[in-house]
Amino acid sequence: MKDLKQCRIEIDAIDQQLMELFEKRMALSKSVVEYKIDHYLEIIQPEREREVIEKNLNRLNNDQLKEYARCFIQEMMTVSKSYQSDLLPLELDKNIKTDFKKDPVVGYQGIAGAFSQSAVENFFGEGTKNIGYRDFEDVYVALENGEIDYGVLPIENSLTGSINDNYDLIRKYGFYIVGETAVNVSQCLMALPGTKIEDIRQVYSHPQGLAQSSEFLYQHRYIEQRPFQDTAMAAKYVMDSKDSTKAAIASPLACKLYGLEMLKENVQNKKNNRTRFMVISKELICPKESDKVSVIFTLPHQVGTLDNMLQTIKQSQINMDRIESRPIETQYWQYYFYIDFEGNMHEERIQRAINKMKANSTTLKVLGNYKRA
């Protein structure tokens, strides 16, 4: 058995060699990233990383050290990518827009009286020209075709969580988030004038409206729930039906607009019910007072990649507000990740943090930088 002092002397000598090799390796990493920048190549290349790991593991003489060696190599590459990310140019275009178009046309899902219409007025002001569309995707198509300048769509409810369709659609169409607003949601039961609750056999509302009112509906289980495209559309449908066995769950404004009678206010499960809406645009707009960044990214399908990304965010000292995952349709059990964090893209530290995130992801896109609601 070797003497402890002698072991430490030999370890110190090896560490010295490692530091010399470390400096050489990092110098080569710098050359690699400079080449990739000049030739417009992706910084992260999962196939190359797998090749490096396997090639080095095959060089081991002691198979019992294989998993330790794997961790060592992966950590070495993580450090290399972090260094490379610091060498990337900062990408914010100084000519990027900071102001919205004057007198815009804004699209939303639903009809007059919808919560989405209230969100339009909250963000752009009363009197803004707005157009309602039947489905969420119709708003994206209208924006794509130039029928509208911006769209306002729900992204999250404080009770029922994310509206996943809009996470998927903003990725599908490649649009940007340029703002957000929140609307207090008061779900109300309404029907034709003179109707009593015990007369009702069907209730119509958007699936979110039904979900948010689940406790009330459980108490009235004899009423059949009928999902509808929109809460305000449901109110209009009930009025047009002239059927006193039908009711809608919608906003007080919809009740007033469509001449229905309010049977019960605030039937939602919790009174503090709010929906957050995003404002979408075909082009990126970063108002100077922005304090929230949204990004979407994918990761190599390897152990520890999500943890590495979260560590990158932590080490960059940025406060993450939210993380959401959505399946990649063409790849089993792999995901798109959406995160929101505090910051302004005009700050150098935020741009450098995003560069580090890019170095740890397969793909990454900034969805927007805007003022939080």
Predicted segments, located by residue:
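Domain-level signature for soluble enzymes in the chorismate/prephenate branch of the shikimate pathway
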Residues: 1-373
